[in-house]
């Protein structure tokens, strides 16, 4: 049984979160949680929260056994970017893009 958890509008760029997502794709959830716990990146905290949510969803909604679960799919899509203005010298201004991402984790017991 596949179970999904999503975090939409996560305040980190998709490029940075994908680096962490690639570390846990295809792993057992216990091993994935260990990897994320000791990965020293902000994105690891975001991905870990979504993975824990997916595990809880599988246990509560589908009655799955946690020991059998694997991360079957994990993907990160770009979310909307917030545009901000950075004042510069001589009356000019630059646009700053504060990027967001949508993190999706699918766990399965197969």
Curated annotation (Swiss-Prot):
GO terms for molecular function: rRNA binding; structural constituent of ribosome. PROSITE patterns: RIBOSOMAL_L22 (PS00464). It comes from the Bacteria. GO terms for cellular component: cytosolic large ribosomal subunit. One of its GO terms (biological process) is translation. Keywords: Ribonucleoprotein, Ribosomal protein, RNA-binding, rRNA-binding. Transmembrane segments: none annotated. CDD domains: Ribosomal_L22. Belongs to the universal ribosomal protein uL22 family. This protein binds specifically to 23S rRNA; its binding is stimulated by other ribosomal proteins, e.g. L4, L17, and L20. It is important during the early stages of 50S assembly. It makes multiple contacts with different domains of the 23S rRNA in the assembled 50S subunit and ribosome. NCBIfam families: rplV_bact (TIGR01044). Part of the 50S ribosomal subunit. This is Large ribosomal subunit protein uL22.
């Amino acid at each position: 049984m596949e179970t999904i958890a999503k975090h939409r509008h996560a305040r980190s760029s998709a490029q940075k979160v994908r680096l962490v997502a690639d570390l846990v794709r295809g792993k057992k959830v216990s091993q994935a949680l260990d990897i994320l716990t000791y990965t020293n990146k902000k994105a690891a905290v975001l991905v870990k929260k979504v993975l824990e949510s997916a595990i809880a969803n599988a246990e509560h909604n589908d009655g799955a056994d946690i020991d059998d679960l694997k991360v079957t799919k994990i993907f990160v899509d770009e979310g909307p970017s917030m545009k901000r203005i950075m004042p510069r010298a001589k009356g000019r201004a630059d646009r700053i893009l504060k990027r967001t991402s949508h993190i999706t984790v699918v766990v399965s017991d197969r």
